[in-house]
Amino acid sequence: YIDKDLFIDKSIKTYQLSDIDSEILNDSLDYRVFDLSAGISNASTSYFHNSINGYHAAKLRRFQEYYDYLSVHDNQKLFNSLNVKYLIGKNEDNQDQLYQNPDAFGNAWAIDSIILVDSPDELLDKLKDTDLRRVGLVLNKSIPTDIPLKYNSSDLIKIEKIKNSSSH
């Protein structure tokens, strides 16, 4: 038996749309948002936006290692490669402030080459010196042997229309 007092009225909204949320929602492109003040495990940003914030007990270990490593070594590389276009942080008066990242790579991008590495630790170590805009790092045992390691513009395709793209 479930008591009716356990149900929440539909008119009660858990999260309120802020001015910053409204400004971000004016952008019609697919991107991610990261709330610097909330931390990686806070899911409130995901209520209105595609976000890299959020908690799940079964979070991908490699993602967590990537986040942990780059959050210490190179935040910009982390945000760019995860398509974080908007960051929410605090200004000097401790008020929420919106920051835009014009260098976000997008949902997908073309690379020139692949560097094969032998272990996840080696992959993390190579992150700090690798231009992820141009080079992909791949675990040696996870890629078919017939995949080329160098690419050029004739290898690209053009996506004309995205169907079923979520605005959120």
Predicted regions and their residues:
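Extracytoplasmic
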Residues: 1-54, 99
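Generic signal for short, ordered secondary-structure residues
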Residues: 3, 57-58, 66
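Aromatic/His-enriched, Gly/Pro-containing loop or helix-boundary segments
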Residues: 10-14, 61-76
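Flexible, solvent-exposed extracytoplasmic
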Residues: 24-25, 46, 53-59, 73-168
